[in-house]
């Protein structure tokens, strides 16, 4: 295959797609360039589907090579290994818009691999990775319905920018990543500084215009270099199977789907499955259909019935209408030793949020293509198996937990005070103790309440809500505060956080071929009504953050020293700062500007440490009188420490108003002396006089 390229203008840059030169044995392999950022993506599929599989086994892995930025990984191991948090998040960003675009019935295992090979520090690799994955699938034999494009949108000086540079992103009030087809939007993920619903919609519209151009270009490329699609393995379930399942299941589903309580409803649905299996897979007989096919059709039939129930009657499984919010219960300060805690319960979804405060050393360190850094606010989301009454693995967080935690973290980031306003490192934990939908939004609500309980001076409280969608041809209905079953069987999961004045985060995933701007407009309007209702419930329990922090939380005081004095405080090999910590029991953090944070449980320890640091960094003043300690005595004079680490010489002639021949009769090592600074020579040597202090009395 010869080398083929195609380009498309996007924003202020041009994106170039190339194939035919590298990885020619892969099903599809594409190099995507923008500026000097280069992302390489491959798409490969198994030749056949597993007969027991009733879903698309899609695996997406994104990796940032440190060599792409001319760097080597820190630490002993120099090879990229376990994916970083960012790599997991970008892998999810690629997966979410691509997954719904495979043709129905395609269950072959598919793997998408995306690597950042070159990074210029100007152009973001994330949208390029999504476009590259789409392009690799488009030119392969894997049956993708239509091309997918993606762009990032920023908002600077009241202007929307398509694919802003890295520097522009730092100034932007919006970070929106949007993906879709030529006709509709498939996925959005955005974080902003209280933008309005209209501003968010405008950003989505601007982004989709660029996506259309990308998709049109990729469709032209498919026609030119694409392989014929392999549809031989598409699984078409027989109509007779649907008819058999519906005849058995429909009468039972009518009742089961109207049971309000989750566990009882699931038990009833399990009975429906058993009834179908007993009829279609009788014991000691050859089953009429494979078990996996029957399970798939039962789920499909259940979805159709639930959807018709909502569309025709505006009644949901738990009895609510489309706009109703579940009952909310809030309890504050339930953990006596925690710095801040909140138990947020919404229906059968419950989150226990815990806030912990600490010094700068508690910050979360990271290393990426931009370099090393620290996060002074971070949120960790945990979804244990007991929250849904199951037995499962407990250990390192999975991709879903990382994604949900980052969404909630970014939603709350907009209200976290600056380091100057609140010098603490803030760690939030969200422990999901019950789950029936919207656990990430319960994390936002519970996390906000835990911050206020800990006394964090947040800018303003925020709440979150998850919206659903039932779409049938031209008919649609938006669901507020969705249940787990509505997420599983519905068409959309649209999460929105903020307050009555604006939005801080939003995330949308869909299972159909895209939705229109008009549907999103209705969803955002309904989401605002819902989150304001939830926020009012939160404010009724906790109107504002506590004026005082927990007595178990550390106290932090900040002092400023000259940058030139940092080395003095740290000492050779850190000897001096370790001595201060051991002597006072405090935690000390110093940044490059000379800002010193001193943290301890009690203020007495902080004051001791401050006094030592002030002494170390104080400037010796000529003419000033100091109280110092005699460090050593020589025949010609006594050396006196007037400040920590600062010694001067009081010559024997300057010791007393009367002439003396020996100092041994007048001073011993360790005695405290009042001395005056007479001079400091060019080598920094300090000349002291005790006689001058006696003469001034």
Swiss-Prot record:
Keywords: Cytoplasm, Magnesium, Metal-binding, Nucleotidyltransferase, RNA-binding, Transferase. GO terms for biological process: mRNA catabolic process; RNA processing. It holds the Pfam family PNPase. Residues 623-691 form the S1 motif domain. GO terms for molecular function: 3'-5'-RNA exonuclease activity; magnesium ion binding; polyribonucleotide nucleotidyltransferase activity; RNA binding. Its main location: cytoplasm. Its EC number is 2.7.7.8. Mg(2+) binds at residues 487, 493. GO terms for cellular component: cytosol. The keyword Phosphoprotein does not apply. Its cofactor is Mg(2+). It catalyses: RNA(n+1) + phosphate = RNA(n) + a ribonucleoside 5'-diphosphate. Residues 554-613 form the KH domain. NCBIfam families: polynuc_phos, PRK11824.1. Involved in mRNA degradation. Catalyzes the phosphorolysis of single-stranded polyribonucleotides processively in the 3'- to 5'-direction. PANTHER family: POLYRIBONUCLEOTIDE NUCLEOTIDYLTRANSFERASE, POLYRIBONUCLEOTIDE NUCLEOTIDYLTRANSFERASE 1, MITOCHONDRIAL. HAMAP family: PNPase. This is Polyribonucleotide nucleotidyltransferase. It comes from Protochlamydia amoebophila (strain UWE25). The lineage of its organism: Bacteria, Pseudomonadati, Chlamydiota, Chlamydiia, Parachlamydiales.
